[in-house]
Amino acid sequence: MLTDEYVKRVYAQVEKRDGDQPEFLQAVREVFESLEPVVEKHPEYEKAGVLERLVEPERVVKFRVAWTDDEGKVQVNRGYRIQFNSAIGPYKGGLRFHPSVNEGVIKFLGFEQILKNSLTSLPMGGGKGGSDFDPKGKS
């Protein structure tokens, strides 16, 4: 449960803006719950807009993935690339190909990638890409 006013306010903004992305909202809430004690001890984070910058991607790219099936028919799927934070280095994050992929899923994975990458000693930012293309059974 979020108790800090700054954390609650930023989470409410995320809910309003990204309410159609439940995977992303869940990840943000869990991270905010973990960060809340630190944010309470450091009011300067609010002035610097740390949480606002953390949850807003630098770039969101949505594109089509066109391919030809075994019968020669052109199929079109959606692809996404979310680039969250390059403050400590270039974006690093893998690709996911699965029918369940949507913008919210890739946004959630990219958000978590920032935190994962920050735990390494390498200068890498966070990002993720993917498509709702299902590679299973394709030649």
Question: Predicted regions: what is each one?
Answer:
Residues 1-139:
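N-terminal ligand-binding/catalytic initiation module
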